[in-house]
Regions:
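C-terminal output helix
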Residues: 108-117, 125
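Receiver (REC) domain active-site loop signature in two-component systems and cognate sites
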Residues: 57
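Active-site residues of response regulator receiver
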Residues: 54
């Protein structure tokens, strides 16, 4: 698989660290952010092929981060995979349905995460 630049955004330290390690072992260049504010800072400094982000975080939540990415890069926003234990909550379920972006229900297994990442990076090329 080609090397891609991925940003992992999650306020859960252990999960974020595991995801970063697994994605690096898969050959990707990976940065991480503890929340949406830090993620926006990193997104302002460099471009990413994929953002793997939690839906619920302190400060800027996943939906707000997604909207900011779309506004900053309307011609080529990064691909996104959402993660959450709250995908059944109506506001998040509606948001996920509207965006059409994939979501991983926490807790998820790492093999499933790796498969979704592979699918998003290889089967959904952005122009």
């Amino acid at each position: 698989m080609a090397r891609h630049r991925i940003l992992v955004v999650d306020d859960e330290d252990n999960l974020r660290d595991v995801l970063v390690e697994v994605l690096k072992r898969d050959g990707h260049e990976v940065d991480s952010a503890v929340d949406g504010i830090q993620a926006l800072h990193l997104l302002g400094e460099r471009s990413y092929d994929l953002v793997l982000t939690d839906l619920r975080m302190p400060g800027i939540e996943g939906p707000e981060l997604y909207q900011a990415m779309q506004q900053r890069h309307p011609e080529k926003p990064p691909r996104v995979i959402f993660m959450s234990a709250n995908t059944g909550i109506e506001q998040y379920a509606r948001f996920l349905s509207e965006t059409g972006e994939p979501a991983l229900e926490k807790p998820f297994n790492l093999a499933d995460m790796r498969q979704v990442v592979l699918q998003v990076l290889t089967q959904n090329p952005r122009p």
